Structure formats: structure tokens, C-alpha cells
């Protein structure tokens, strides 16, 4: 047996080998040591030589095969690959050693077991190809069969590859040697995305073989959509498919829907922008709560959740496609009863995509198939609800296939509550198969059958004392007393002589004995055979099931966006090609959702193609500059996925890319300081942005000396504003108040500030964006709010006055009087600030009434 193990292990050196022995998966040698450490398993040995030290014996450990999913999940999470070696021969019929073989290699990017997967997130394995002229990118989620591929050419090919990796965030990537040697690419994969990288030889990226593999998997029509002038798409996809076939040992028939997309179909976002805008997870905690996805995701199915995440990762650039989607959201907003009933109907559908994936793989159990049946049973009601809409995208979704024939097939075949394992039996429905029913009758009614046979033999022979008994030596027998042995028929075969009688057998009794004793094994084997046939038949309908699952997922997403729009009072934006960003009373979607009891101060925004193209925003820290800039970017993204936006009204011209330069930390591992990171990011932005891009730039130049920083900030601002160089719409937050002088001298530049009301040595943040530059920085006041000791704050004020006297001017030039915020806005801000600081639970009724009088007085 160990020789067989070593032969199989030799072919799977890079994986932990799960070697099936009876009801256990065993691991030996180094695999056992690793598994023992990672899985907290007891390390033992098969060597029985008591004289040999333990450290010289071959170590081993094992796990029950029925609990393997949880153990595999833990190993995969730690970055290991697991090769599963099964017994491919029935031990009962094997002559000598049982045949074994690898049935599948589980890697981080090829997981299909529910225990290893996150419901609302796709698990992609990527294929990357890079050379001197082009780059290819492909991803496949084998748990659902979804496959995407694209390719790039030119000097920016590697940058586009990086952005696609940030978009899909694969769990594993297979790469060609040139891609592996690309430092930024490898760093992104391993250090930031924590992606398992599999380096393949150059021989695995041969165009002719790649094209053949793609054609075999997807067909001629799909393969023909790949670009003829750029072989990188086929090379990356062909190598990826080859790797999947090699590790999964199956034809992957559910991987049959190829999405080839081109640059220009979707907004491109780099990893920095995705993280700064917190699209799918927060920057600090890496949690979904607090992200834009958390606000928008009210989906009822796992596949709907994954699709919504995909929409957020791939904002559209086509006005037609955006309007089509937002119109469907609008229909659901207007039809409250249909929307709410649809949400309820979707709630019980579950994860059809991944269920059908496990069915194709042959790993689905009876409970998985019944779960699919229960999901499909809800489809007629979903179709009925969608039929309320006879036009637009919802009208198209109403044409979904309800799969009633498959629901009926599963319902006729399987019982409603099958056992955990299909090897346990008792899951084929009664009446479906006559032989199963007969064997079950024998199995459950053995005593009754024997009693009936005994009565029949008594009547046939006339022997009143005849009885049928059983023992382990002879099995079933017929016992006749000596007084009646002369009446025994010739068909009886004497088996044993007793003092008081004789024991006989008959052929009929032996056949019945065989049936009774073997019924359990036979019925289990027959039920498993029938279940396997059912799985195979369902696998033949995989394309139908996937198409329906896709329609359900889209309906779920549209329903979610509509529910959020209604709950949060969003508006439907007008999306066009104007290039204008015009928002009336816009709000930050996440901030207001995280603080539902607080009053969010809305703000207007106008950014044109020529006038007001660049907004210089000044004001103290904590006043809300970053929140305001992010909310503009998030509303653009929301509009371009077809969502409503948090505003009273909005007109949003298509933005091709959103760039952010917000905050930084020293990248010590790369030997880069905060300032170097900042300058690198700014450089990347200025090289990649276009006049259709939106730039969010916060505190450019703060990581160096004042004059250096101010010079860089001004030069960057001039470059962004100049239509001959870039001319991109830019939100530029700064503490360099000298830059406000550029309004009026640099076309397209407009000054704004965050309104602040000073009351003695205290300040109130009004959170309102108003025209004009800030009159001062309020740095010392912010320091006081942060809790610096009074002595430090007092000393800082003295030093500030001294510096102002020495320089002959205040720390910042006062803003023009006409740009000051109105008294009403100030009063409103003071009221909001007072309410936020009030501990409501500690107020007496009289104190609460007094507070209301005070607040009302401020507003009147």
C-alpha cells in the first residue's frame, strides 16, 4: 500500500495528499507533519517496530472522509493545495490491493465546497499572459461556471492588467514566466490581493493549443469573439482552462458561458481608488459593513449578491445600458407591492448557480438536489410577478424558464428530506422504482415474509408443528418434529438432525435468505445508481438552469437597488454624455446609512466641461472635505451601475475613470516614504487620466517642505485644469490657501470652502460647501477638539500670534465678505452640532423642553 501511496505522491509533490483508506483520508510523511500542525491532528505512525525511535518512523494522521470539507477549507485558507485520492474500485470485489487515483486537486481558485466559499463573493482563478507587446487576462469561477476574458496592447498593458486584477481579486492566478517576473504584478498578487500564484512554463502558452482548448470548451462561435489581432486573450484563457482540467479531472461542462469584454465597456478603477472609496470593504477593518456594497446590497439570493458586487466592480460606460438598468429600478420603485412580494419570493431560492456546479461535478448530495428543486419550485411565482412588467429589462426577465419539468423530475425521484449522505439510502421516493420498493419491503418486512412462508408451508404439507428458524451457522431453516418427518416433501433438503426432529432447507428459502440478508446492500447500491442517473440527467440541462439563475440574480439586484432607493429617498439621475456633474442636495450614501439618527447636511455640486471644471476646496480638518469629495465620486459610480443616487436631483455625465489620492502611509517594505507614495500615485493619475475622468486629490504636497509642497500642488492643479494637457474634472482639497488665488487667473477653477462658525475659541463645523476660499485653517481649534492638553493649546495660540506679527500678516488671508456663509446656515449648523453632542437619555422632560426652546430660538 505504501508503494502505491508513494507513486501517487510523486505526481503531486506540491499538494497535501488525502489518501483514502476505508472511512478515512490518511496523510503520511511531510504531509502528515503539515496537516498535524495546521489541523491540530494527533501524529501517529504505521510502523509497529517498538525498538525504532518515533522520529525514525513514517508519521501519519487522518480525518474521517465525511468531515473532509471542513478540513480542506482550513488548509486552503492557509494557502495549501489538497490532492484527493479515492478508491476507484469496490474493496469487496478487489483482488489484492484496491485501485486508487487522484479524482481532484483542490486549490484556492478551484474550490466548490460550500464550506470553503463566501456566499456573496465569487471565487476566481485567473490566467495572466504578458509579453513585450500585449497582455491577456481571464478569470473563471468554477463554482458557478462564469468566465471573463479580455486583452490589452501598448505601453499601458501592464497597468490595465493590474486594474483588472483589482477588479476581480482572484484567489489564485496561473501566470506565464514574463508575468511572474513583472515586479508590480507579482507584488499586487501576493502582497495586496493575497493571491496564490502558480507559475506555468512557457510551453503551456502555445497559441494553437490554446485556441483548440477554448474552442472545445466554449464552441466555435464563442471562440470566434476573441480578438484576432491580439493573441493574448486566447493564450491566457487557454492556459487557465488547461490548468482547470488538469486539477479538476473533469470536462467542466458547466463552464460554457464566455464573456469577452473590451476596454471601454466598463469604468476602469485602480486598486487605490477601489480601496479609498471603500466600494466593497472598509479601508481599515476590511469588512463589508461601512462600504458602499453594504448600503446597496439588500439582495435575497447569494447569486444576486455576487452579481451586485460585480456591477459595483464594473460600472458601465454606455448611456443606453445604464438607462436601461435604471429604468428597471424605477419600475420597481413605482410598484411597491410587486417589489415587496418579489423580494419575498426570491428569499427562498438559494444559490442555484453553485448547486448546479456541484451537480455537474458529481459532488452534490441528495440535500443539494432537493434544495435545487425547492428553488425551482418558486420560479413560477417569480415569473408571475415579473409579468406585471411588459416592457424594458423586467419584461425580458419575465420570460425566464421556470424549469417545471426538472422540478417534477426531482420531486418524483427523491424524498423531501433525504439523509446527509447518499450512501445511507432511504432517499429515493416510494413508488419511483419497483425494485427499490421490493427490496425495501424485504428489508423492513423480513419477519413478516418469513411468517407468511411458514404459514404457507404448514398449509401445503399439513405439518402443524412446522416452523422456520434462523441461526448464524445454517442461516434460515425449516424444522419438523420426528412425528411428522414422513410427511416432508421431496423438495426439502435435510440440513441437520436433532434429537426431536430434523432441519431442512429449500431453494425458495435460500433465495429468500439471500434477498433478506443482501437487501440492505442491494437497495443502497440501487438508490445510489438511480441518484447518479438523476445527477447526470440534470447535468444535461445545465445551460437552462444557469440561464434561469442569471435572470433570477438580475431581478434580485434590481429589486435590491429599488428597495434601497425607496428606503433612503434616492433620486433617479439623468445620465448623459455631457461631461457635466450637477448634483442638487447630494448626500454621502454610507455616512448617512451608518448614522441613521443623525441629520446629514446635503450639498450641491456643479462641475462643467469648461467652467467650474476644477474645484479648490479649503477648510479645516474634520470639517468634511474628504466626505464631500468621496460622496461625489460614489454618486458617479452609483449612477453608472444603474442605481438611484442620494440627492434631490442629479445630472451626471459619463466618467471613464475615477482616480483618488487620499491619505498615505509609509511603504517600508518597498523602501518608500509617505511622500514618495503620494508622488507615485499622482504621477500614475496624471499619466492615465483623460478629460472624461474624475480626480479626487486630497492634500497634494503635504509630505514635504511648505514651499516644495505648495509648488507641486500648484503645478498639479495647473496641469489638471489645462484643457491642452488634461482638462479633467478635479476636486482638489488643500490647506495651501495661497492656491485660492488661482480662481480668476486659471480658467475653469472655482474656490469652495467648508463653512465654519467660530465662537470665541470654539468652532462649529457646519458641513456646508460654500463658494470662496477659507479665511483660516482653524488648526489649533481642531487640535483642541482632538483633546490636546490645555497648556499645549494655549502655547500654540501664543506662538501663532507671534508668527503672524513677525510675518506681518495673518496665517491665512481672509475670504471676501460676499462669500461668507449665511446666518441661517450658521444657525442650522449650530443646531445640528448641539443635537449631536446632546445625551438625550440623560435629559429630564423639563431639560428637553428647555433645549427645544433654545434650538428654536437659534433658528428664528
Regions found by a protein language model. Give the residues of each.
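Short flexible coil/turn linkers enriched for glycine and charged/polar residues
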Residues: 11-13, 76-78, 119-121, 130-134, ...
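Amphipathic alpha-helical transducer elements in NTP-driven molecular machines
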Residues: 2, 18, 29, 62-72, ...
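Intracellular alpha-helical coupling/juxtamembrane segments of multi-pass membrane proteins
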Residues: 322-325, 345, 349, 446, ...
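Active-site phosphate-binding and catalytic loops of NTP-dependent enzymes
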Residues: 85, 108-117, 251, 389-393, ...
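Amphipathic heptad-repeat alpha-helical coiled-coil/stalk segments that mediate oligomerization
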Residues: 202-217, 267-271, 283, 374-452, ...
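ATPase nucleotide-binding head domains, primarily ABC-like/P-loop NTPase cores
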Residues: 29-32, 230, 300-301, 311, ...
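Charged catalytic and DNA/RNA-contacting regions of genome-maintenance
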Residues: 1-331, 340, 347, 351-360, ...
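Conserved catalytic alpha/beta cores of large enzymes that bind or transform nucleotide phosphates
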Residues: 165, 170-179, 184-187, 199, ...
Amino acid at each position: 500500500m505504501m508503494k502505491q501511496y508513494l507513486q501517487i505522491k510523486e505526481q503531486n509533490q506540491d499538494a497535501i495528499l488525502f489518501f483514502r483508506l476505508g472511512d478515512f483520508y490518511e496523510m503520511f510523511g511531510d504531509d502528515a507533519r503539515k496537516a498535524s500542525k495546521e489541523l491540530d491532528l494527533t501524529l501517529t505512525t504505521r510502523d509497529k517496530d517498538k525498538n525504532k525511535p518515533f522520529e525514525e518512523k513514517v508519521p501519519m494522521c487522518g480525518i474521517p472522509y465525511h468531515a473532509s470539507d471542513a478540513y480542506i477549507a482550513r488548509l486552503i485558507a492557509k494557502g495549501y493545495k489538497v490532492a484527493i485520492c479515492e478508491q476507484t474500485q469496490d474493496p469487496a470485489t478487489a483482488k489484492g490491493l484496491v485501485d486508487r487515483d487522484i479524482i481532484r486537486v483542490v486549490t484556492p481558485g478551484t474550490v466548490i465546497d460550500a464550506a470553503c466559499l463566501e456566499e456573496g463573493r465569487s471565487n476566481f482563478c485567473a490566467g495572466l499572459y504578458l509579453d513585450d507587446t500585449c497582455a491577456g487576462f481571464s478569470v473563471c469561477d468554477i463554482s458557478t461556471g462564469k468566465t471573463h476574458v479580455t486583452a490589452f496592447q501598448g505601453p499601458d498593458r501592464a497597468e490595465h492588467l493590474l486594474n483588472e486584477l483589482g477588479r476581480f481579486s482572484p484567489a489564485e492566478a496561473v501566470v506565464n514566466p514574463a508575468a511572474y517576473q513583472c515586479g508590480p504584478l507579482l507584488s499586487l498578487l501576493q502582497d495586496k490581493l493575497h493571491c496564490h500564484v502558480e507559475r506555468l512554463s512557457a510551453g503551456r502558452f502555445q497559441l494553437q493549443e490554446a485556441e483548440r482548448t477554448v474552442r472545445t470548451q466554449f464552441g466555435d462561435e464563442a471562440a470566434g469573439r476573441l480578438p484576432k489581432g491580439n493573441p493574448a486573450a486566447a493564450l491566457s484563457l487557454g492556459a487557465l482552462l488547461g490548468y482547470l482540467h488538469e486539477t479538476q479531472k473533469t470536462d467542466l461542462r458547466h463552464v460554457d458561458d464566455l464573456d469577452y469584454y473590451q476596454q471601454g465597456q466598463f469604468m476602469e478603477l485602480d486598486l487605490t481608488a477601489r480601496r479609498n472609496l471603500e466600494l466593497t470593504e472598509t479601508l481599515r477593518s476590511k469588512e463589508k459593513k461601512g462600504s458602499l456594497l453594504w448600503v446597496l446590497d439588500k439582495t435575497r439570493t447569494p447569486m444576486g449578491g455576487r452579481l451586485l458586487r460585480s456591477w459595483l466592480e464594473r460600472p458601465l460606460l454606455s448611456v443606453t445600458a445604464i438607462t436601461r438598468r435604471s429604468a428597471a429600478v424605477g419600475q420597481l420603485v413605482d410598484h411597491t407591492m410587486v417589489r415587496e412580494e418579489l423580494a419575498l419570493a426570491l428569499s427562498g431560492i438559494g444559490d442555484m448557480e453553485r448547486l448546479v456546479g456541484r451537480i455537474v461535478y458529481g459532488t452534490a448530495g441528495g440535500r443539494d438536489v432537493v434544495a435545487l428543486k425547492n428553488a425551482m419550485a418558486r420560479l413560477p411565482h417569480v415569473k408571475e410577478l415579473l409579468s406585471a412588467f411588459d416592457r424594458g429589462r423586467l419584461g425580458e426577465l419575465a420570460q425566464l424558464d421556470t424549469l417545471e419539468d426538472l422540478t417534477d423530475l426531482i420531486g418524483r425521484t427523491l424524498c423531501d428530506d433525504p439523509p446527509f449522505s447518499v450512501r445511507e439510502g432511504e432517499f429515493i421516493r416510494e413508488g419511483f422504482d419497483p425494485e427499490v420498493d421490493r427490496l425495501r419491503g424485504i428489508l423492513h418486512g423480513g419477519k413478516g415474509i418469513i411468517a407468511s412462508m411458514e404459514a404457507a408451508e404448514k398449509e401445503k404439507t399439513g405439518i402443524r408443528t412446522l416452523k422456520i428458524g434462523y441461526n448464524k451457522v445454517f442461516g434460515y431453516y425449516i424444522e419438523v418434529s420426528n412425528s411428522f418427518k414422513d410427511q416432508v416433501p421431496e423438495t426439502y433438503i435435510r440440513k441437520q438432525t436433532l434429537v426431536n426432529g430434523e432441519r431442512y432447507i429449500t431453494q425458495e428459502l435460500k433465495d429468500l435468505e439471500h434477498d433478506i440478508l443482501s437487501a440492505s446492500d442491494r437497495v443502497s447500491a440501487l438508490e445510489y445508481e438511480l441518484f447518479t442517473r438523476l445527477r447526470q440527467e440534470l447535468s444535461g440541462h445545465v445551460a437552462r438552469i444557469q440561464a434561469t439563475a442569471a435572470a433570477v440574480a438580475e431581478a434580485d439586484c434590481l429589486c435590491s437597488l429599488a428597495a434601497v432607493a425607496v428606503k433612503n429617498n434616492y433620486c433617479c439621475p439623468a445620465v448623459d454624455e455631457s461631461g457635466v456633474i450637477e448634483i442638487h442636495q447630494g448626500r454621502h450614501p454610507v455616512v448617512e446609512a451608518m448614522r441613521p439618527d443623525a441629520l446629514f447636511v446635503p450639498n450641491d455640486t456643479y462641475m462643467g466641461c469648461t467652467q467650474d471644471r476644477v474645484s479648490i476646496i479649503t477648510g479645516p480638518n474634520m470639517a468634511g472635505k474628504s466626505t464631500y469629495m468621496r460622496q461625489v465620486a460614489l454618486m458617479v459610480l452609483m449612477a453608472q451601475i444603474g442605481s438611484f443616487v442620494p440627492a434631490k436631483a442629479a445630472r451626471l455625465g459619463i466618467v471613464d475613470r475615477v482616480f483618488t489620492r487620499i491619505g498615505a502611509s509609509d511603504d517600508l517594505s518597498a523602501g518608500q516614504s509617505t511622500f514618495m507614495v503620494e508622488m507615485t500615485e499622482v504621477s500614475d493619475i496624471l499619466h492615465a487620466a483623460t478629460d472624461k475622468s474624475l480626480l479626487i486629490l486630497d492634500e497634494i504636497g503635504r509630505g514635504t517642505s511648505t514651499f516644495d509642497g505648495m509648488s507641486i500642488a500648484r503645478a498639479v492643479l495647473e496641469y489638471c485644469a489645462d484643457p491642452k494637457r488634461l482638462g479633467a474634472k478635479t476636486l482638489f482639497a488643500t490647506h495651501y490657501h495661497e492656491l485660492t488665488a488661482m480662481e480668476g487667473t486659471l480658467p475653469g477653477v472655482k474656490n469652495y470652502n467648508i463653512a465654519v462658525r467660530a465662537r470665541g475659541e470654539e468652532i462649529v463645523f457646519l458641513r456646508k460647501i460654500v463658494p470662496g476660499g477659507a479665511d483660516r485653517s482653524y488648526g489649533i481649534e481642531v487640535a483642541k477638539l482632538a483633546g490636546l492638553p490645555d497648556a499645549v493649546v494655549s502655547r500654540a495660540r501664543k506662538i501663532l500670534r507671534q508668527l503672524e506679527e513677525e510675518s506681518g500678516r495673518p496665517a491665512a488671508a481672509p475670504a471676501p465678505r460676499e462669500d461668507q456663509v449665511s446666518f441661517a446656515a450658521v444657525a442650522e449648523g449650530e443646531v445640528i452640532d448641539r443635537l449631536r453632542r446632546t445625551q438625550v437619555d440623560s435629559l429630564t422632560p423639563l431639560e428637553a423642553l428647555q433645549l427645544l426652546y433654545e434650538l428654536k430660538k437659534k433658528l428664528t
